[in-house]
């Protein structure tokens, strides 16, 4: 239909794309710039981690909460509130990462018939999957896997990598998706057990 507009852009977050689409003649607010900065894992703007920690604490999100947020030039008040939350979050992430173990996953690499076993680090983490996954990726040099059991007994997997390692190759094998440095899929408990042998 003529009413559909699709834009795929790996250099902008969905929040930034939506703002620019619906407000083409308006300066992008600092809040949206910070959301974009964190969503793409750039952290080029001071305070993005703190701001995200504050926003994550608002869950479950509602339109009333978003309407109450400041879209002013600075987000200084939100940074300050988020800084305390971020300190506590970082402690939790480090505690979770301390329980990681090696994970061995086979996935395609290069050609269709070229499969490799890759060793990374994995941990059960129902919270802070992105942060935990990135810490594990830094430690392993390949990938980090933050997983948890959902209410149906399926294993929700959040893969992260830093640099050139492509975690989407793993997720796609198991019916998931994502991009080079962040991907996810859902697998059975038996599959997870194979990865953690």
List the predicted regions and their residue ranges.
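Short alpha-helices
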Residues: 1-62
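Electropositive phosphate-/nucleotide-binding environments in soluble metabolic enzymes
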Residues: 12, 25, 29, 83, ...
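Residues that form generic nucleotide/phosphate-binding pockets
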Residues: 21, 34, 38, 54-57, ...
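Generic signature of intrinsically disordered, low-complexity segments enriched in small/polar residues
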Residues: 22-25, 57, 66, 74, ...
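Short alpha-helical "patches" and their helix-cap loops
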Residues: 28-37, 66-77, 149-154
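Active-site rim beta-loop-alpha module in soluble metabolic enzymes
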Residues: 45-124
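Gly/His-enriched, cation/cofactor- and phosphate-binding structural elements
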Residues: 94-197
């Amino acid at each position: 239909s003529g009413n559909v507009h699709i834009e795929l852009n790996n250099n902008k977050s969905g929040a930034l794309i939506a703002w620019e689409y619906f407000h083409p003649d308006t300066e992008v607010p600092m809040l949206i710039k910070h959301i974009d900065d964190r969503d793409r894992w750039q952290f080029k703007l001071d305070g993005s981690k703190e701001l995200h920690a504050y926003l994550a604490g608002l869950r479950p999100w509602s339109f009333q909460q978003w309407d109450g947020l400041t879209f002013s030039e600075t987000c200084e008040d939100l940074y300050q509130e988020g800084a305390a939350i971020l300190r506590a979050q970082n402690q939790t992430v480090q505690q979770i990462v301390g329980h990681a173990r090696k994970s061995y996953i086979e996935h395609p690499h290069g050609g269709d018939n070229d499969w490799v076993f890759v060793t990374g680090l994995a941990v059960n983490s129902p919270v802070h999957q992105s942060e935990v996954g990135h810490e594990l990726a830094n430690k392993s040099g390949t990938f980090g896997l933050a997983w948890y059991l959902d209410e149906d007994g399926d294993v929700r997997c959040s893969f992260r990598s830093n640099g050139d390692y492509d975690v989407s190759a793993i997720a796609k094998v198991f019916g998931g998706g994502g991009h080079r440095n962040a991907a996810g899929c859902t697998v059975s408990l038996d599959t997870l057990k194979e990865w953690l042998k």
